[in-house]
Amino acid sequence: MAAAALAPAAAQSAKGIDLENTLYLDVEYGRVVIEMRPDLAPNHVTRIKELVREGFYDGIVFHRVIDGFMAQTGDPTGTGSGGSGKNLDAEFSSEKHVRGVVSMARAQSPNSADSQFFIVFDDAPWLDRQYTMWGRVIEGMEHIDAIKKGAGQGGAVSDPDAIVQIRVAADVKE
């Protein structure tokens, strides 16, 4: 009985973070901690965790980075046109796209999100209710700010920074 009572606490860190719904995204500049929001986008969070646990994102570049707007990654081709091959239906919410929010990138169709995601550098209200928000940066936003920016409105980055690795916090033994 005592072990069962302790089980939920095992999934919480000393800081009260839900480790099963927290990502450690490591870049050259340091660790970024992302709190995932299964309450907003349960299917997206499930898929992101599947991809993370497969090592899908490790080594993938931030191919599109627009200063003052966002940093986009998650395309294994590094071109902005690739993905994992599995589209997800939109899970739009009323949450606001503010600094540090993590959302899925998509094509024209609302149901075309796959593996690409972006982190906003600043508030972006024009994205609200248009993109599936599945998390937010809770530590290390300065490392996202340090990512090399692209040129022009398209934000294509020559010699882009890459994700070193992403891990679900519950899977990391520290």
Regions found by a protein language model. Give the residues of each.
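Cyclophilin-like peptidyl-prolyl cis-trans isomerases
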Residues: 2-174
